[in-house]
């Protein structure tokens, strides 16, 4: 599954519901990737976990910015 990189500008343009849905999907993807790795296999793309974690961080950062 190819995932587009979300930039902060794109995230800010999303509605709160869209951000929550995207965050949920990213966390599920991260869980899936970590499960593959823990079962002894290696991820087809080693940088994928790092990319997913960064996207989650971007989403959470924008969420916290909007709370201020």
From Swiss-Prot:
CDD domains tied to this protein: Ribosomal_L29_HIP
A single MF term (Gene Ontology): structural constituent of ribosome
Annotated InterPro entries: Ribosomal_uL29 (IPR001854), Ribosomal_uL29_CS (IPR018254), Ribosomal_uL29_sf (IPR036049)
**What GO cellular component term, any one, is given?**
ribosome
Segments crossing the lipid bilayer: none
Q: Which UniProt keywords apply?
A: Ribonucleoprotein, Ribosomal protein
Biological process per Gene Ontology, one example term: translation
Question: Does the record carry Ribonucleoprotein as a key word?
Answer: yes
Question: What Pfam families does the record point to?
Answer: Ribosomal_L29 (PF00831)
| Family that this chain belongs to | Belongs to the universal ribosomal protein uL29 family.
Which HAMAP family does this one have? Answer: Ribosomal_uL29 (MF_00374)
Q: What name does UniProt use for this protein?
A: Large ribosomal subunit protein uL29
Which source organism? Thermoplasma acidophilum (strain ATCC 25905 / DSM 1728 / JCM 9062 / NBRC 15155 / AMRC-C165)
